[in-house]
Design a protein with these regions (language model features):
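Short hydrophobic/aromatic segments of transmembrane alpha-helices and their interfaces
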Residues: 1-2, 48
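Catalytic metal-binding acidic patch
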Residues: 3-40, 124
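Conserved aromatic-histidine-acidic binding/catalytic patches
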Residues: 8-11, 42-43, 112-120
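Phosphate/oxyanion-binding loops and surfaces in catalytic or ligand/nucleic-acid-binding neighborhoods
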Residues: 25, 61, 134
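A basic- and aromatic-enriched beta-loop-alpha substructure that forms the phosphate/nucleotide-
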Residues: 29-107
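N-terminal secretory/targeting leader peptides
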Residues: 60, 195-196, 200
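Conserved nucleotidyltransferase catalytic core and NTase-mimicking acidic/glycine-rich helix/loop elements
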Residues: 76-196
Length: 202
């Protein structure tokens, strides 16, 4: 599970955002029509990636994918899912230093200072907090309990635009180097996992 309930930022109106990973039968790749790389549903706000697509995005340090691997709310896992979680550090690399800041910057540029979308502003700050924790400690910060009150104040529009941009600038400035992250992900370990998973799905 991801979203506000995983971050510790849920309110009474919050949806339940589910994200998952599935393994397509190996024989389905032998056909001309390949299996989907992702599917939506069957529940509302549910989205799942085929395992190879998921691993590819994780190796690229996609923030959403990396936070899925560290989500504290897990509803169901299979043996393949347990193994995926056990190798989650293999996906980490210094490129996350760029992707987290880049994603947050893209959100910031879409905000209108005259009429800010405060929920989006909150998640922009939350993403920077998560990425900074990842750079310093080697794993993203998913639950933001220590920052909950201030983040929710942003969402309610109780902080001024200047205060939000100042908080953003302080966080961006702190991204001076990748810190605890390795230069490259452990692609060999990820490929071994994929091969074993495909063999098990024959």
């Amino acid at each position: 599970m991801v979203g506000s309930r995983a971050y510790g930022l849920e309110t009474e109106e919050s949806d339940v955002d589910r994200r998952g990973v599935f393994v397509a039968p190996t024989r389905s790749f032998w056909r001309l029509a390949k299996p989907p790389t992702h599917v939506e549903g069957p529940l509302p706000e549910q989205f799942s990636w085929e395992v190879e697509r998921f691993c590819g995005l994780a190796l690229e340090a996609n923030p959403t994918i990396l936070e899925c691997l560290w989500s504290p709310v897990v509803e169901h896992t299979t043996p393949a899912g347990e193994e995926l979680l056990s190798i989650r550090h293999a996906f980490l690399s210094g490129r996350a230093h760029r992707t987290f800041v880049g994603y947050a910057d893209a959100q910031f540029r879409r905000l209108n200072p005259e009429r800010p979308r405060w929920k989006q502003a909150m998640h922009m700050i939350r993403l920077l907090l998560s990425g900074l924790h990842l750079a310093r400690h080697g794993e993203p910060l998913v639950r933001v309990d220590a920052h909950r009150d201030r983040l929710l104040a942003v969402r309610r529009g109780e902080l001024s635009w200047d205060e939000v941009t100042r908080w953003r600038s302080e966080l961006v400035t702190s991204f001076d180097d990748p810190g605890a992250l390795p230069a490259e992900p452990d692609r060999r370990r990820v490929e071994e996992y994929l091969i074993n998973t495909r063999e098990a799905a024959l």
